[in-house]
Amino acid sequence: MRFGGQRRCIESSDDNDSIDSMSIQQKNKEKEEWKWAQSLARRLEQVLNVHPEKYQNGCSSQRPSRQPSPVEQLAPIRSHSADFGRAAEMASGNSEEGKGMLLRNGDDRIRLPSPQRGTPDTSSTQGHPYTDQIVTINVSGMRFQTFESTLSRYPNSLLGDRNKRQHFFVSDTNEFFFDRHRTTSSSFTFEIRNYLFESILYIYQSGGRVKRPEIVPIDIFLKEMRFFQMGDDLLEEFWIAEGYEKPKEVMMPNNKTQRKIWELMEYPDSSLSARIIAFISIAVIALSIISFCWETVPSDIEEKPINNSATAELLDEMDEKHYSPFFWIELMCILWFTIELILRFISCPCKVTFATSVLNIIDFVAIAPFFVNFFFADTSKSNSSMSFAVLRVLRLVRVFRVFKLSRHSVGLQILGKTFRSSVQEFCLLIFFMAIALVLFASGMYFAEQGEPNSKFTSIPASFWFVLVTMTTVGYGDLVPLSPFGKVVGGMCAMIGVLTLALPVPIIVANFKHFYRQENRLASMKSKGDDADDDIA
């Protein structure tokens, strides 16, 4: 019995040993399969360039941290389309892997050859963009990197011209350093960004798209564009992007004397003498308008019927007016206007442009009636039947002198630009008013046709009532009497309000646009001159 039990114990122990050996073999097999799977996965990651930072130093057991190094935090490297930077874990030895640079775009990284220390390479920049030379730009401590071919898109700029940017090269750090304004912003991710230079660099990357960040003032952005010598075309693109057109280049006379006279008469802000002349011109215009209005105040003048005898008496009174103070005031004003117009015409750089200018035509029309009235008075006496109407028209033309103030008033010039840009809206308003005028005048005539005391005797006679009602003036000289006439009048008033309200916001928007543009032009001109002085 003892031997039998001992035999069974030995057999059971042998079975346990065989089971343990089988489990060990199975575990070893699983480990080998797992190692094979891991090696295959690592091989696939290397081929597919997934997490390349794990294989920089030939070690796959440790995965580098995603947190940037203190150097990266102090000097972040920025670019608009891709973020270039050196990895914190990149080896500093002589191995081939340690000599590379990482091109970071999101979470994927691609190893590129790092630029050599010392003088930058001046070899050709043609070829694939990922094999192009990388240029490092340091703007007040913030580093940017881009390809040299990107900067060469604008070869005349400061960054695009190698000779120009060579003056800012620092050989110790192998970068171009610019001590410029640094408009930065830190978001909730504690990411510091230089929006000002990013927008400058974006001009190179986008091929000429100028976009000013909202946090960057206009004068600072313009100063930076002038510093980096972006060119007139990009400056014009910037002006258009800001909502206004670049002012046209002013033609100036080549002759020195003509240039001085032209500046005195045409540009009041050019000198103190020009301001004095402009002030005298405004005073003479005001005096002429006051004299023109005060001359019509009745004193001992009696209304006379318009006939040949009245015309003859009017012509005789012209001789008596030579002794009137209004005549001498008019003569003095006309002499000033004439001298001013002649000096402008003599010194202008282009005679054709001067003759076709609206303001110059107004100046000529303002002085022409006086000379026609003065030199042809004797001739008018022989043909008195037509001279009376001509003289009245010439007197009426004198009122156009008020438009001479537009030469010295920016507000009147803005109003004129608004009217010119709103011609389509005015035509649309007149078209709607004409349709409503015919419809409601016809309705009012037929609605009031049965009333005995109605003043709406015809459709043209109803035009006045419809026009006054649609413009919400309502003189009250014409009033509908029938109930249907009152209904038509009420509908006419409501339609008139809607018709007038539709184009008015567009006209107001045009006025605001030109007003804001004029203010910006003045601000940009002053700040641009300051920027030129700073750059010089």
From Swiss-Prot:
Biased composition (Polar residues): 116-131
Tissue specificity remark: Expressed in a variety of interneurons and sensory neurons, as well as body wall muscle.
Pfam families listed in its UniProt record: BTB_2 (PF02214), Ion_trans (PF00520)
Region annotation Disordered: where it falls in the sequence: 1-31, 87-131
Chief place where the protein resides: membrane
A GO term for molecular function: delayed rectifier potassium channel activity
Entry keyword set: Ion channel, Ion transport, Membrane, Potassium, Potassium channel, Potassium transport, Transmembrane, Transmembrane helix, Transport, Voltage-gated channel
Mode of membrane association: Multi-pass membrane protein
Transmembrane annotation, as ranges: 276-296, 323-343, 357-377, 426-446, 459-479, 487-507
Coiled-coil regions listed in the entry: none
Record-linked Gene3D superfamilies: 1.10.287.70, Potassium Channel Kv1.1, Chain A, Voltage-gated potassium channels. Chain C
Entry-linked SUPFAM superfamilies: POZ domain (SSF54695), Voltage-gated potassium channels (SSF81324)
Family named by the database record: Belongs to the potassium channel family. A (Shaker) (TC 1.A.1.2) subfamily. Shaker sub-subfamily.
Primary role: Mediates the voltage-dependent potassium ion permeability of excitable membranes. Has an important role in repolarization and in regulating the pattern of action potential firing. Isoform a expresses currents in a more depolarized voltage range than isoform d.
Protein's UniProt name: Potassium voltage-gated channel protein shk-1
Gene: shk-1
